[in-house]
């Protein structure tokens, strides 16, 4: 038994796995130093996360959960400020737990009646907690922070004190995919908080998230958020009472953002973010050092399986198995099955813990095993040649 174990874990398999992980690291370093020939690969990896596959798998299920804490009210076709003020008051009358208004009322309009009606609503006609939207602007690359903010006219022009949260959507650098949302950002010498963070804290009373996180990785669960038309609020009082209610444009094509679930409205991204914070389901990735350690272990195991099965096939008495072993088809099949099993395990672990392992590097390492074997054979032969030369001289 000891001999078999020693044979299975022979140093050459360890060396092949080590070469594969080194090749993987070299590619990663190529990304970091922006080597031009690796640009296409870099872009592909930058716009890819294993969690995208997990979210897609979850949302393929026919049975989806209906949110019991968040309701959307669609105001896509409402542009009149007086009518918007009425909608806000109607929502307030249904006794929501807290409201989020995903609208920035930019500047005074010629419609003075609409302006005054909205100001009256903001100052006197709302009894429920409300968080109003605003935008952070003028990003300073040198200071790595926003330097200004753009508020609704009743804050900018009249200085009315309201609870606000920024709604800047956060995209990946190249891909433009929205995978996270800011919790807080530094502006001047103080922190500004996002509307999802303020809504979540307003609902739960727990402000831990404000201190613990700068960003919230969004958990795109298989959830349906009830959506009410702006003119059907009273008929859907049960979907508003005690809920977080987000008023915004759910079907405005100008406010669509690309996410792991495809293009969805900005207000729906806010809903997913609030749900993630409230349910404490913020996805986390394994630490980098742990990821690289387990990547090596997984690559080593893959090499042991590939080498062991290929060797057995080549020694088989059956012609077909012998031929399969000769053409190294076993190694390719084992690699595919191994990757599928690894991704499946990662998915199961993520669904149950909200922690995910970046299997992309393992997949790359396993794909490089054949190349690593050839490099190892080349190094071994070169060493043997030099070693034989020394022996002959002696």
Which positions does each model-derived feature cover?
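A diffuse structural propensity rather than consistent per-protein peaks
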Residues: 80, 229, 358-359
């Amino acid at each position: 038994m000891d001999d078999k174990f020693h044979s299975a874990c022979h140093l050459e398999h360890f060396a092949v796995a080590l070469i594969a992980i080194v090749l993987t690291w070299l590619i990663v370093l190529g990304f970091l130093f922006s080597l031009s020939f690796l640009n296409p690969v870099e872009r592909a990896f930058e716009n890819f996360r294993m969690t995208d596959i997990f979210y897609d798998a979850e949302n393929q299920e026919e049975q989806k959960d209906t949110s019991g804490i968040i309701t959307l009210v669609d105001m896509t076709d409402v542009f009149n400020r007086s009518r918007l003020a009425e909608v806000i008051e109607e929502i307030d009358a249904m006794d929501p737990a807290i409201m989020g208004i995903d609208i920035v009322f930019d500047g005074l309009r010629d419609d003075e009646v609409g302006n005054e009606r909205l100001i009256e609503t903001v100052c006197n006609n709302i009894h429920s907690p409300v968080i109003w939207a605003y935008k952070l602007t003028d990003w300073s690359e040198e200071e790595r922070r926003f330097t200004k903010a753009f508020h609704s006219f009743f804050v900018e022009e009249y200085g009315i004190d309201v609870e606000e949260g920024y709604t800047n959507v956060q995209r990946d650098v190249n891909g433009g995919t929205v995978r996270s949302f800011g919790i807080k950002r530094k502006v001047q010498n103080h922190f500004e908080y996002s509307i999802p963070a303020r809504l979540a804290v307003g609902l739960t009373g727990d402000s831990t998230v404000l201190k613990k996180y700068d960003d919230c990785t969004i958990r795109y669960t298989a959830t349906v958020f009830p959506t009410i038309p702006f003119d059907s609020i009273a008929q859907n009082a049960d979907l508003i009472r005690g809920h977080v209610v987000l008023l915004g444009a759910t079907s405005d094509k100008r406010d669509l953002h690309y996410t792991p679930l495809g293009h969805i409205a900005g207000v729906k991204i806010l809903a997913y973010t609030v749900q993630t914070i409230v349910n404490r389901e913020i996805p986390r990735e394994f630490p980098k050092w742990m990821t690289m350690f387990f990547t090596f272990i997984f690559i080593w195991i893959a090499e042991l399986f590939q080498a062991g099965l290929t060797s057995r096939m080549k020694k088989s008495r059956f012609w077909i198995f012998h031929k399969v072993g000769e053409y190294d088809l076993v190694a390719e099949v084992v690699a595919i099955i191994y990757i599928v099993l690894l991704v499946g395990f990662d998915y199961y672990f993520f669904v149950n813990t909200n922690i995910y392992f970046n299997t992309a590097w393992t997949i790359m390492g396993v794909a490089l095993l054949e190349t690593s074997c050839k490099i190892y054979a080349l190094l071994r032969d070169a060493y043997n040649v030099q070693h034989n030369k020394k022996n002959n001289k002696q």
